[in-house]
C-alpha cells in the first residue's frame, strides 16, 4: 500500500511550528481513546502539538480527527482469538507494523510517545523504544492489557488508573471531564435532598442488555418504590429497554445517550452501571455510590478487578452478571433505596478515590520525560541532527524480536509501508 499524504492539521495559534509534538498511541475502544484525548487537550492548551497513531478503520479514525488532531494509521489488528494459521503469521505482521511505525516516528519526530493501549500501540511503542524516543505507558484498568504489559518492560514511566496493576507504577488516575470533577461534594448535593430516590442506570454507548432486563425486574419486584429512574441504554437497545420497563410497569426516562454527564451525576443518588475504567473514574470524581455489574465477557475479566477496588473502599456493591442478577439486584436496591446515610457514605468514599487532576499529571510527566532524553529522537536534537541520526540505540535486554524489528527500521521507499495518514479537522 502507498502512503497517503495529507495537509497537516492546524494546531492552536499559540503552538509554534518549530515545537515538536507528543505522539499518542491509542485506539480500538473509547476506554483507550478518551483518556488520550483528555491528555491531548491539556498538552495543546500548553502549546504542545499532538499527533496520533492508530489502526486502519478503527474507532480512533472517526473520533480523533473531530478534535483537529492529525492521525496516522497502521494495517494492524488484534491477535487474541485468531486461528492457528493467523497466529503463526503474526510475528511477520508485527515486524512489518513496527517497521511502518518507525517510518511514522521518523516523519513526525515526536519529543515523546505515550501508549494508552490498542492495536497500534504495540508497534508504535516498540518503534519508539528502538529509535530512542522517550516512551511512557498509561494503563486504565487494574488488569493490564496485553499491549501495555509488553511495553511496560521498557517504558520510561508506567502510569496507571488504579493502584496494583504493575510493579513500579505511578497511580495517577484516569482522566475525566472537567465539569464532572468540578461537581460539589456529595454532602452538599445529597444531604437534605427530598422526594423519590434518583437512580441513574448507565449501559454505555453500546448499551447493556443485562441491565435492561435486571433493573426493571428488580424494581417491579420491590413493589414499585418511590424511585425516579434515568436509564442510558445505547441507541441499538433503546426499544428493548423501553419494552422491559413497560412490561414491568415501571416508569423510567430511557435515553440512548446522555450529552451532559456532569448534570446526570449531580442529579443521581445512586448509579447502577458496568465497571469500565472511565466510568468508574467518573463515578469517583462525581462522588456517587454505585452498584457495579461488570461485563462478563471483558478481556481478562478486567472490569471485575476495577470494581473490586471501589468495593474495597466501601464505595460500591459488586454484583456478578448471571441468571440471578435481577433477584440479587432487588435485594441490594431494597437496602440502599431505604438508607440515605449509607448512600452518602458510599458517595463520600468514592470521592476519596478520585484523581481529578489525572490529565494534568500525565501531561506533566510526559513533558518531564521529553526533556530527559539521552539519545534518539527524544533528546531535543534539531531536525537536521535527527535526519542524520541513523543509529538505533538498543538496550542489552532487548530480545531477538526487537532486534529483528530494529533491523527493519532503516529508511525504505514510502510505497512499501502499510500506512494511512489523515488530517483532522474541527467539526
UniProtKB/Swiss-Prot annotation:
It is a peripheral membrane protein. Pathway: Cell wall biogenesis; peptidoglycan biosynthesis. The gene is murG. This is UDP-N-acetylglucosamine--N-acetylmuramyl-(pentapeptide) pyrophosphoryl-undecaprenol N-acetylglucosamine transferase. It comes from Xanthomonas campestris pv. campestris (strain B100). GO terms for molecular function: UDP-N-acetyl-D-glucosamine:N-acetylmuramoyl-L-alanyl-D-glutamyl-meso-2,6-diaminopimelyl-D-alanyl-D-alanine-diphosphoundecaprenol 4-beta-N-acetylglucosaminlytransferase activity; undecaprenyldiphospho-muramoylpentapeptide beta-N-acetylglucosaminyltransferase activity. InterPro entries: GlcNAc_MurG (IPR006009), Glyco_trans_28_C (IPR007235), GlycoTrans_28_N (IPR004276). HAMAP family: MurG. PANTHER family: GLYCOSYLTRANSFERASE (PTHR21015:SF22), UDP-N-ACETYLGLUCOSAMINE--N-ACETYLMURAMYL-(PENTAPEPTIDE) PYROPHOSPHORYL-UNDECAPRENOL N-ACETYLGLUCOSAMINE TRANSFERASE 1 (PTHR21015). Cell wall formation. Catalyzes the transfer of a GlcNAc subunit on undecaprenyl-pyrophosphoryl-MurNAc-pentapeptide (lipid intermediate I) to form undecaprenyl-pyrophosphoryl-MurNAc-(pentapeptide)GlcNAc (lipid intermediate II). The lineage of its organism: Bacteria, Pseudomonadati, Pseudomonadota, Gammaproteobacteria, Lysobacterales. It is found in: Cell inner membrane. GO terms for biological process: carbohydrate metabolic process; cell division; cell wall organization; lipid glycosylation; peptidoglycan biosynthetic process; regulation of cell shape. UDP-N-acetyl-alpha-D-glucosamine binds at residues 29-31, 141, 177, 205, 258, 303. Belongs to the glycosyltransferase 28 family. MurG subfamily. It catalyses: di-trans,octa-cis-undecaprenyl diphospho-N-acetyl-alpha-D-muramoyl-L-alanyl-D-glutamyl-meso-2,6-diaminopimeloyl-D-alanyl-D-alanine + UDP-N-acetyl-alpha-D-glucosamine = di-trans,octa-cis-undecaprenyl diphospho-[N-acetyl-alpha-D-glucosaminyl-(1->4)]-N-acetyl-alpha-D-muramoyl-L-alanyl-D-glutamyl-meso-2,6-diaminopimeloyl-D-alanyl-D-alanine + UDP + H(+). Keywords: Cell cycle, Cell division, Cell inner membrane, Cell membrane, Cell shape, Cell wall biogenesis/degradation, Glycosyltransferase, Membrane, Peptidoglycan synthesis, Transferase.
Amino acid at each position: 500500500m502507498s502512503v497517503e499524504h495529507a495537509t497537516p492539521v492546524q494546531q492552536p495559534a499559540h503552538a509554534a511550528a518549530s515545537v515538536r509534538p507528543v505522539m499518542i498511541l491509542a485506539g480500538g475502544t473509547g476506554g483507550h481513546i478518551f483518556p488520550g484525548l483528555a491528555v491531548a487537550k491539556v498538552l495543546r492548551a500548553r502549546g504542545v502539538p499532538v499527533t496520533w497513531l492508530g489502526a486502519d478503520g478503527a474507532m480512533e479514525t472517526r473520533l480523533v480527527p473531530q478534535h483537529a488532531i492529525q492521525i496516522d494509521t497502521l494495517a494492524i489488528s488484534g491477535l487474541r482469538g485468531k486461528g492457528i494459521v493467523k497466529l503463526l503469521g503474526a510475528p511477520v505482521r508485527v515486524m512489518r507494523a513496527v517497521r511502518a511505525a518507525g517510518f511514522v516516528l521518523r516523519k513526525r519526530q515526536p519529543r515523546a510517545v505515550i501508549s494508552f493501549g490498542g492495536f497500534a500501540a504495540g508497534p508504535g511503542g516498540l518503534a519508539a523504544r528502538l529509535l530512542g524516543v522517550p516512551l511512557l505507558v498509561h494503563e486504565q484498568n487494574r488488569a493490564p492489557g496485553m499491549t501495555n504489559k509488553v511495553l511496560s518492560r521498557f517504558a520510561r514511566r508506567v502510569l496507571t488508573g488504579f493502584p496494583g496493576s504493575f510493579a513500579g507504577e505511578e497511580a495517577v488516575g484516569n482522566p475525566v471531564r472537567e465539569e464532572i470533577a468540578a461537581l460539589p461534594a456529595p454532602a452538599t448535593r445529597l444531604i437534605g435532598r427530598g422526594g423519590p430516590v434518583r437512580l441513574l442506570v448507565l449501559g454505555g454507548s453500546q448499551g447493556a442488555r443485562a441491565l435492561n432486563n435486571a433493573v426493571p425486574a428488580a424494581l417491579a419486584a420491590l413493589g414499585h418504590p418511590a424511585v425516579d429512574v434515568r436509564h442510558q441504554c445505547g441507541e441499538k437497545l433503546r426499544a428493548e429497554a423501553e419494552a422491559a420497563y413497560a412490561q414491568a410497569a415501571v416508569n423510567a426516562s430511557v435515553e440512548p445517550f446522555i450529552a451532559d454527564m456532569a448534570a446526570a451525576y449531580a442529579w443521581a443518588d445512586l448509579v447502577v452501571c458496568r465497571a469500565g475504567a472511565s466510568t468508574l473514574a467518573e463515578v469517583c470524581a462525581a462522588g456517587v455510590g454505585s452498584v457495579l455489574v461488570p461485563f462478563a465477557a471483558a478481556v481478562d475479566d478486567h472490569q471485575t478487578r476495577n470494581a473490586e477496588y471501589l468495593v474495597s473502599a466501601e464505595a460500591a456493591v459488586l454484583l456478578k452478571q448471571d441468571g440471578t442478577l435481577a433477584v440479587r439486584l432487588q435485594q441490594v436496591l431494597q437496602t440502599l433505596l431505604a438508607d440515605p446515610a449509607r448512600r452518602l457514605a458510599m458517595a463520600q468514599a468514592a470521592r476519596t478515590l478520585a484523581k481529578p487532576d489525572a490529565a494534568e499529571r500525565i501531561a506533566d510527566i510526559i513533558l518531564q520525560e521529553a526533556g530527559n532524553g539521552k539519545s534518539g529522537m527524544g533528546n531535543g536534537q534539531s531536525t537536521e541532527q535527527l535526519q542524520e541520526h541513523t543509529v538505533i540505540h538498543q538496550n542489552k535486554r532487548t530480545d531477538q524480536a526487537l532486534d529483528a524489528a530494529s533491523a527493519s527500521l532503516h529508511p525504505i521507499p514510502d510505497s512499501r509501508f502499510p500506512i494511512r495518514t489523515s488530517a483532522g479537522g474541527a467539526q
